Amino acid sequence: MVRPKKKPVLGKDGKPLSAAAAKLRLLKRLKCTTKYEKLAADSGAKLIAGIDEVGRGALFGPVVAAAVILDPNYRIKGLRDSKLLPAETREILSKRIREHCIAWSIAAVDVARIDQLNIYWASNLAMKHAVRGLSCQPDHLLIDAMKLDLDCAQTPIIHGDALSASIAAASIIAKVHRDALIREWAPIFPEYDLASNKGYSAPKHIKALREFGPSPLHRQSFAPVWMASAPQEVLEFMLEETADTAVPPEVLED
């Protein structure tokens, strides 16, 4: 049976949006609330942690995860998926989250481990390390679309960072931390334009990989990295693919 082809999502100009841009539009329409936290509390949970990771799709640098237990008696306004927030707002919220939450923890898995395990299991590992790093252990986990091998009640939520305040808080402090790491490395590896692309796939990044080869902090198991020395026609195909899947510029802004 042949499945009907999905209709493309169109932008304001009537042209089809890339997959990444279409997802970003969807996320903007979702409402971030404490609905899932309240459901967990109603089931008897006292310490509810939100967990998320950032950098999963990047070509360069670690994958970073965070776990946050928000104080249910202190509301932090403006929490939403970190991809939807300007960098300055993320910085302000990250500080506020760390100051007013019950507990928070950040963990990173480096490129060597990513290449050894694959990015799915490396992300999973980073999340587990983040949970274990909390100063008090939670009795319920809210996780962005993943389950962890931990002895704790869990609720995986698709688009959780756009729907759950706790997961959104985790996504914010994880992104602020990872972006700070990238800022430190950008002057060391200026040829890859890391200040602009944050280590993600982008046409200038792909071209730099072809011209200079990968750095020690690139993920050698990722196709755009190990294919950097591919023939020109393959590179052109990769650039076309990148144009559709690259993270929209507003997500990467400083």
UniProtKB/Swiss-Prot annotation:
GO terms for cellular component: cytoplasm; ribonuclease H2 complex. InterPro entries: RNase_HII (IPR022898), RNase_HII/HIII (IPR001352), RNase_HII/HIII_dom (IPR024567), RNaseH-like_sf (IPR012337), RNaseH_sf (IPR036397). Residues 46-234 form the RNase H type-2 domain. Keywords: Cytoplasm, Endonuclease, Hydrolase, Manganese, Metal-binding, Nuclease. Transmembrane segments: none annotated. SUPFAM superfamilies: Ribonuclease H-like. The keyword Disulfide bond does not apply. It comes from the Bacteria. It is found in: Cytoplasm. PANTHER family: RIBONUCLEASE H2 SUBUNIT A, RIBONUCLEASE HII. Belongs to the RNase HII family. This is Ribonuclease HII.
